[in-house]
Amino acid sequence: MTDEFSPLSVQDYASQALTTDQRSDGGSLAFPLLGLFGETGSLLSEVKKKQRDRASYLGYAAAVVDELGDVLWYLTAVAARGGLSLSDIAGNLSRGYSDWQRAPDTALSFASGLPPEKWSSLK
């Protein structure tokens, strides 16, 4: 079986996705923002399951694709309702990153955000 598809531009995706936004809440940002937060949480939950179950979690790739699709849909709705173009947001990638400093490649831990005297009292 061959899946046939036509690649979409960011703007084409946004235009098609917005035709499925059926909420009649006057264009409020509340619903799509809550949806974006919820779907991002669902994506993080899939990552958690993969870390916990490792190789035994066979549905990971499909679940991540599904959740990322939902995140993208809600991001599109938030952008549109906020008067922004998804193309403009995606175009932000072309800006320079000279203002970003490279962080050291160290493991993230709860202790890394605490002053040493606080961490030593928790040991």
Where are these regions (language model features)?
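Flexible "arm" and connector segments at domain edges
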Residues: 1-123
